[in-house]
Amino acid sequence: MKLLENSSFEAINSQLTVETGDAHIIGRIESYSCKMAGDDKHMFKQFCQEGQPHVLEALSPPQTSGLSPSRLSKSQGGEDESPLSDKCSRKTLFYLIATLNESFRPDYDFSTARSHEFSREPSLRWVVNAVNCSLFSAVREDFKALKPQLWNAVDEEICLAECDIYSYNPDLDSDPFGEDGSLWSFNYFFYNKRLKRIVFFSCRSISGSTYTPSEAGNALDLELGAEEADEESGGGGGEGRAEETSTMEEDRVPVICM
């Protein structure tokens, strides 16, 4: 899996980390190519030792609704209903696991993840609604401006109408967002088989009482700031640094989500 550059996602991600007072929202959207090379090919061969690439694996029912995709199609009376709607091939499962590994490395390893920790979502509409409700409940009106920008960027990158959508719903022991203070989280994969690409949308809400800046990936910024402060401590740089930080805080704009 290779992370693909996307300037629109980078701009949106800068707005997906926001403090709401009671909680902190930390989110990101990333695009990955499913074309395997090097380590991916080696890992895929090992993965396929447990079953051939096209063998179907059972998935868990989706959490965005009370119906699985297969039951939904049956309830709607569709002639093309498929009893395999709640399954995916081992190759697709590998793509999902490899995306998690690439996105969360080096902090987490998902190589032992199993198919029951994933779900296939019933429809794009339900997923969009679930994401919008989570983000709107967290940041309210601030999300309205970001909402169309976010989904337009995702659609341009992955062509949502062609996607199968999966979610990662692990148990507490495996959940990278299962730490103390976690209020909610979601991990969605928008998989376009034709483009051989996955857009991964991950977001979580952390209680303000347990949140630390490093959880949002700011540890390096803090270290660099400390080094600069040490270098300037002899010439009044500390005071200038404090003024600069104050200005940055005043200019910071709350993140907007849809």
From Swiss-Prot:
Listed Basic and acidic residues bias regions: 240-253
Keyword list, A-Z: Cytoplasm, Isopeptide bond, Nucleus, Phosphoprotein, Repressor, Transcription, Transcription regulation, Ubl conjugation
Inactivation phenotype: MAF1 deficient mice display a decreased metabolic efficiency. Constitutive high levels of Pol III transcription reprogram central metabolic pathways and waste metabolic energy through a futile RNA cycle. MAF1 down-regulation also alters the expression of genes involved in lipid and sugar metabolism.
Modified residues (Phosphoserine): 60, 65, 68, 70, 75, 214
GO biological process: negative regulation of transcription by RNA polymerase I; negative regulation of transcription by RNA polymerase III
Entry-annotated residues carrying Phosphothreonine: 64, 212
Stretch list, region Disordered: 58-85, 226-253
Biased composition (Polar residues): 61-76
Location(s) in or outside the cell: Nucleus; Cytoplasm
Main subcellular location of this protein, as a coarse class: nucleus
Assigned GO CC terms: axon; cytosol; dendrite; inhibitory synapse; nucleoplasm; nucleus; perinuclear region of cytoplasm; plasma membrane
Pfam families reported in the protein's UniProt record: Maf1
Post-translational changes noted in the entry: Phosphorylated at Ser-60, Ser-68 and Ser-75; the major sites of phosphorylation. Nuclear accumulation correlates with a concomitant dephosphorylation. Phosphorylation may attenuate its RNA polymerase III-repressive function.
Molecular function in Gene Ontology: GABA receptor binding; RNA polymerase III type 1 promoter sequence-specific DNA binding; RNA polymerase III type 2 promoter sequence-specific DNA binding; RNA polymerase III type 3 promoter sequence-specific DNA binding
Cross-link (Glycyl lysine isopeptide (Lys-Gly) (interchain with G-Cter in SUMO1 and SUMO2)): 35
Known role: Plays a role in the repression of RNA polymerase III-mediated transcription in response to changing nutritional, environmental and cellular stress conditions to balance the production of highly abundant tRNAs, 5S rRNA, and other small non-coding RNAs with cell growth and maintenance. Also plays a key role in cell fate determination by promoting mesorderm induction and adipocyte differentiation. Mechanistically, associates with the RNA polymerase III clamp and thereby impairs its recruitment to the complex made of the promoter DNA, TBP and the initiation factor TFIIIB.
PANTHER family named in the record: REPRESSOR OF RNA POLYMERASE III TRANSCRIPTION MAF1, REPRESSOR OF RNA POLYMERASE III TRANSCRIPTION MAF1 HOMOLOG
Family stated for the protein in its record: Belongs to the MAF1 family.
Complexes and interactors: Interacts with TFIIIB subunits BRF1 and BRF2. Interacts with Pol III subunit POLR3F. Interacts with TFIIIC subunit GTF3C1.
Name used for this protein in its record: Repressor of RNA polymerase III transcription MAF1 homolog
Species, as recorded: Mus musculus
